[in-house]
Amino acid sequence: MEYTVNSFSEHHAKLNTQINAGDAPDVFWVNPEYMRDFVDRDQLMDLTDLMDKKGVDVSDYLPSSLEKMQYVGEDGDTHIYGVDCCIVGPVIFYNKDLFDEAGVEYIPTKKEDQWTWDEFVENMKKLTKVEDGKTVQYGTSNFEEKFSLYTTLELLGSNGAKWFNGDYTQAVGIDSEATRDTLTKIKELRTVYGVAPNPTAVGVDTSHSPTQMFMTGQVASIFVGSYALQELSQSGINLGAGLPPKMAEGTKPIGSANLDCIWKDTKHPEEAFELVQYLTSVDVCSDVYKTGLWMPNRVSLYKEENQDKWYNPEVYPQGWLDMTWLWTEASLRPFDHLRNTDEIYDTCTVYMEDYFYNDGNLDSILPEWQEEVNALLEE
């Protein structure tokens, strides 16, 4: 078996080129936001019959994982074109020592104790330190995250902003009051309350990236995908983890992760599917789950009697098991069933940065933003 590695920035374009040239690998991973384009181009093998033939219990996949794997064809039937191995989604990691110094209670891990947005802001104020007119410690960071990741999208959904219709063919809620309210609150963390750093000031200095600022004590907490735990658990920080704050009725978590797919024209379909089964098996993935990089994507693994297959108390912060609903109840990340996703990402970045950093007006930005995304979805 030959194994090749691509950089993420060129991976999907290179795959498309290889497939068009008839020289693609038999098995490859695809980030879910690119799946619809590969499916629409008829480049992936339909795994539905093989899954059934091999007795794969698809009902054991978490709802968001199964939705990500399934596509409704022109025949109206559901088809599976890729298999995932995990789920990730955003949580708030924090430095317990900095919370103790400020006399701030730890961020709740139980749903019934979850902070409201206002409670979160007030506590982040207590964690922010200013010396001689300069902020030397911020309360939190990474809420202004790019749309290809998680935090901004989760807050939008939690505040009731439903950006797309049911089959992800039309943008319906970019220009909405929920979007206005969410983006305003995120920006105010930095511009009104001063509890978050300006990410545009980072430049190429990676020592001031959100993660590095957190690990060096310049920020007390960071809102980021759960995958960050693998790195943060090795940082030496007295690490805690808690629920994101509620914006409206409560958090509506999102989750995602890449899928393993098979080239439609592979000469070895049975062997390729056997490899996909191996790569996505619990036996293989459990070792990665225990590092904190991934969370399990199977319903059965969250049952108490199976938690020892993934839960590592030396890695996962106290209270983590209270938060597993963030993954078991997660919805699919809304960008994961779009077409022309790269172009949509670029458009979203332009409009979001115009508002966050150029004092753009949401009343004029959001209608244009929605119109441009719809034009891309119609291409």
Regions of interest found by a model, annotated:
Residues 48-61, 109-113, 131-132, 138, ...:
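Short, solvent-exposed loop/beta-turn-alpha elements that line the ligand-binding surface or hinge
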Residues 227-231, 258-342:
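Mature extracytoplasmic/periplasmic domains
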Residues 1-64, 97, 101-103, 107, ...:
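Extracytoplasmic "Venus flytrap"/periplasmic binding protein-like
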Residues 72-86, 90-92, 100, 116-172, ...:
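Extracytoplasmic/periplasmic solute-binding protein
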Residues 75, 315-372, 377:
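C-terminal capping/gating helix-and-loop segments adjacent to ligand/active sites or protein-protein/ligand interfaces
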